């Protein structure tokens, strides 16, 4: 949060002193982008408070150097991501008929640990077609959603097998 403040104050001298009260409800090490969302929302708040008039694209550029996934939280909507997760295209995804269950085991996975085990495999056929799926508006089809994969899963589950066990139990219970 402070890095965002410093960075934006350097770019926009009209940003004055601020008093920040911060309450965090996102668990650490859960892969939910807590620090990145904090950075993005600090930039959004400074933009509003000091009436900077920055677009989402400009705000995304401001926070991009602080973390590859920071721009995602500026958009605050499901997105198709390319590159290192910083090139974004908003997509329509209706999950209104589904229940979301979040389970945070005792183990935690740092961003460095998660990214450290990823071996680029090239773009999958599903990912090549994801932009087309957006156009066809079929991303809400559960059979399509079930074909998407999480690139972090293999690495994280090797280090923390309890995560693989939790996932399997959810799938056995009918999760998508």
Q: What is each of the regions a protein language model found here?
A:
Residues 10-19, 45-65:
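Phosphate-handling active-site elements
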Residues 2-15, 22-26:
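N-terminal lobe of the biotin/lipoate ligase/transferase fold
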Residues 51-91:
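Glycine/threonine-rich beta-strand-loop-alpha-helix active-site module
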Residues 16-18, 68, 77, 99:
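A generic structural signal for short beta-strands and their flanking turns/coil linkers
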Residues 75-76, 80-176:
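Conserved, helical-rich catalytic subdomain that frames metal- and/or nucleotide-binding sites
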Residues 18-31, 176:
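Short pre-catalytic strand/loop immediately N-terminal to key active-site residues, enriched for Gly-Thr
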Residues 30-56, 72:
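DPxDG-like acidic metal-binding loop motif
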């Amino acid at each position: 949060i402070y890095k965002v403040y410093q960075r934006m104050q350097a770019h926009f001298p009209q940003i004055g002193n601020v008093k920040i009260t911060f309450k965090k409800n996102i668990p650490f090490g859960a892969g939910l982008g807590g620090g990145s969302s904090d950075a993005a929302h600090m930039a959004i708040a400074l933009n509003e408070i000091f009436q900077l008039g920055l677009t989402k694209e400009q705000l995304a550029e401001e926070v991009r150097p602080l973390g590859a996934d920071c721009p995602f939280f500026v958009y605050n909507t499901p997105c198709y991501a390319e590159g290192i997760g910083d090139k974004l295209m908003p997509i329509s995804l209706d999950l209104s008929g589904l229940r979301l269950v979040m389970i945070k085991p005792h183990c935690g996975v740092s961003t460095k640990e998660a990214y450290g085990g990823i071996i680029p495999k090239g773009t999958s056929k599903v990912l090549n077609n994801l932009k087309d799926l957006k156009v066809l508006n079929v991303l809400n089809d559960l059979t399509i959603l079930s074909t998407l994969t999480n690139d972090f899963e293999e690495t994280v589950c090797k280090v923390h097998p309890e995560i693989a066990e939790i996932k399997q139990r959810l799938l056995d219970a009918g999760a998508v």
